[in-house]
A protein has these predicted regions:
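Terminal "cap-and-tail" regions of soluble proteins that handle hydrophobic small molecules
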Residues: 1-15, 114-193
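Aromatic-glycine hotspot motif
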Residues: 1-29, 107-110
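Intrinsically disordered, low-complexity boundary segments flanking structured domains
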Residues: 9-14, 50-52, 97-98
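Short beta-edge strand/loop motif at the mouth of beta-sheet-based domains
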Residues: 17-18, 24-25, 31, 35, ...
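Hydrophobic pocket/interface hotspot
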Residues: 36, 46, 73, 82-84, ...
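Hydrophobic-ligand binding "helix-grip"
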Residues: 54-55, 62-126
Length: 193
């Protein structure tokens, strides 16, 4: 688990509530696209590697993501695209899952989180909102791979990944990559992954 094969990208784009800063996580899985789609949209499977998810998992439906808030499914085009608006009306954040076939039966997953928020408070400290995404999504993309390979421990609670030492390398790598991209953006240079 110490090797992080996740690629990171940063960009800006418009969402419902204004200009958003976007963190993009790209990873290739050795699994068919339909299996990756099911793992990312089936509430039973999501609860194993991501978080408990409940609600109406159709376009226009409302979902809850455990302690991660609730949202509305804006677009759903199985097995390629899922867009969820989060944080009110208009949405302050948007997450988008994009899948495409990769070489030799693999699947390329792109997970994008767009936010109009500048910061998040964690443990009484203020952090850049994009920087914080690395700590959450980095280890979850690792656990998705373990889940797809049938190697995820049965007693793993995905809501506590940040507390488990075996996921520290994925958290650190993701947060470091996103911090570099955010700093590049603040300096006015064109960011690259």
């Amino acid at each position: 688990m110490s090797t992080d094969r996740t690629q990171h990208e940063f960009r800006r784009r418009q969402i419902e509530s204004g200009e958003a800063r976007c963190a993009i996580f790209r990873r290739t899985y050795d699994a068919p696209m339909e299996d990756v789609w099911d793992a990312c949209t089936n509430p039973v499977r999501l609860s194993r590697w991501y978080a408990p998810v409940a609600g109406d998992l159709r376009e226009g439906g409302t979902i809850t993501q455990g302690d991660f808030g609730s949202g509305t499914i804006r677009r759903c085009a199985a097995p390629h695209l899922l867009t969820v608006a989060l944080g009110g009306d208009p949405a302050l954040d948007e997450i988008e899952l994009r899948l495409q076939p990769g070489p030799d039966g693999t699947t390329v997953l792109e997970f994008e989180h767009a936010t109009t928020l500048d910061s998040h408070e964690i443990g009484g400290q203020i952090f850049d909102a994009v920087y914080c995404m690395g700590g959450g999504y980095g280890p979850r993309l690792v656990t998705l791979g373990l889940h797809l390979r049938g190697e995820l421990p049965a007693d793993l609670d995905p809501t506590t990944l940040h507390l488990l030492p075996e996921f520290a390398p994925a958290i650190t790598a993701s947060m470091r990559a996103l911090d570099e991209l955010v700093q590049t953006d603040k300096a006015g240079a064109a960011p690259c992954a």
